[in-house]
Design a protein with these regions (language model features):
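Feature for intrinsically disordered/low-complexity regulatory segments and propeptides
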Residues: 1-69
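Intrinsically disordered, low-complexity regions enriched in serine/threonine
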Residues: 1-26, 30, 86-88, 101-294
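A near-ubiquitous, low-amplitude feature marking generic local secondary-structure context
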Residues: 33-34, 50-54, 79, 151, ...
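A generic structural signal for beta-strand entry/edge sites
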Residues: 35-36, 46, 91-93, 127
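Generic structural hydrophobic/aromatic packing signal, biased to beta-strands
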Residues: 38, 96-98, 119
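Residues at beta-strand starts and edge strands
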Residues: 65, 90-92, 113
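Hydrophobic, Leu/Ile/Phe/Ala-enriched alpha-helical segments that form helix-helix packing faces
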Residues: 66-79
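A short acidic/basic microdomain associated with nuclease active sites
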Residues: 76-102
Length: 294
């Protein structure tokens, strides 16, 4: 759903209809410890706990208004309406995408991408991060190639971001250069050929031959990735794969897509959870390194 800039605050506050508050922690004898915990104010018990560690009295958790300020600043990168998706998992995560007019064709008119800014605002004491990624229609991958110059910006967490909107907007506008760099890289990757079998060997290595489970997991993963590539070649109008040769762009997306959509995740992982997990996946990082340095 496309959202006008004037409606962003309502969308964010509806999605995050709670605040994270800092409360003092007590010892078993009810004596103060000098430490504090972070809790959602809409839940009780262990469900309310945010994060896995305590904080000091000096720590100030960010607010929903800070998240709104970040999203509003991000939306300024794109002209017109945006599409916003929100997620909370020990922190606020928001993706901001423009309308379909921003799509860029990579191969024909079926394999195309458009920009997506992913905002990460955790409660771990680290700076907020904004990353310019891409959404690929063909496989529904939302990927972030952080090794590409200009695609990541950090925002220092201060007591209030609202008075610093001009600085925020300037910071997010730098991601436009990152998008230009990213599209140039992607267009180059589409022109480069790689042997998919050798590429996957470089990413995953060989299984432990004396471990039947390791061999089975490896074989199933490779088969799933080859199936993913064959399907994507068919739906994008590419010719059938011969001699294991594909573009470096296809090879990277095959690894990233497997991590995002096919690999096993614990619990009831949402689409946003799976995207975040894939962005941290060591094999995806290795695949990115290989296609960018070859």
């Amino acid at each position: 759903m496309n959202i006008q800039a004037s409606d962003l605050k309502q969308v964010i506050t509806d999605a995050f209809n709670f605040e994270v508050v800092k409360l003092p922690l007590s010892a078993p004898d009810n004596q103060p410890t000098g430490y504090y915990g972070l809790f959602r104010d809409d839940l009780t018990g262990t469900d309310a706990v945010v994060g896995s560690s305590s904080v000091t009295s000096r720590y100030v958790p960010h607010t929903n208004d800070d998240v709104v300020a970040l999203v509003e600043a991000a939306s300024n990168v794109f002209d017109g309406d945006v599409d916003v998706k929100c997620h909370f998992n020990n922190g606020h995560y928001v993706s901001v995408k423009p309308t379909a007019d921003h799509r860029i064709n990579i191969y024909g008119d079926k394999d195309n991408i458009f920009p997506s800014i992913v905002i990460s605002a955790g409660f771990d004491g680290r700076a907020f991060q904004a990353t310019m990624g891409y959404y690929r229609d063909l496989c529904q991958n939302l990927a972030m190639m952080r090794q590409v110059s200009g695609t990541c910006q950090t925002i220092r967490h201060t007591r209030s971001l609202r008075p610093k909107m001009n600085d925020l907007i300037a910071t997010f506008n730098q991601l436009e250069d990152g998008w230009n760099n990213l599209t140039n890289v992607i267009e180059h990757l589409e022109t480069r050929e790689v042997d998919l079998s050798q590429f996957l060997m470089a990413v995953y290595g060989s299984p432990e031959e004396d471990s039947k489970r390791s061999v089975t997991i490896h074989q199933n993963r490779i088969e799933a990735i080859f199936k993913r590539v064959r399907n994507e070649r068919f739906y994008s109008g590419r010719p059938r794969m011969t001699n294991m040769v594909v573009s470096a762009w296809e090879a990277y997306n095959a690894v990233q897509g497997y991590a995002q959509h096919d690999s096993t995740r614990r619990g009831n992982a949402t689409d946003f959870d799976r995207m975040l997990s894939a962005s941290r996946d060591g094999f995806v990082k290795r695949a990115e390194e290989l296609v960018l340095t070859a």
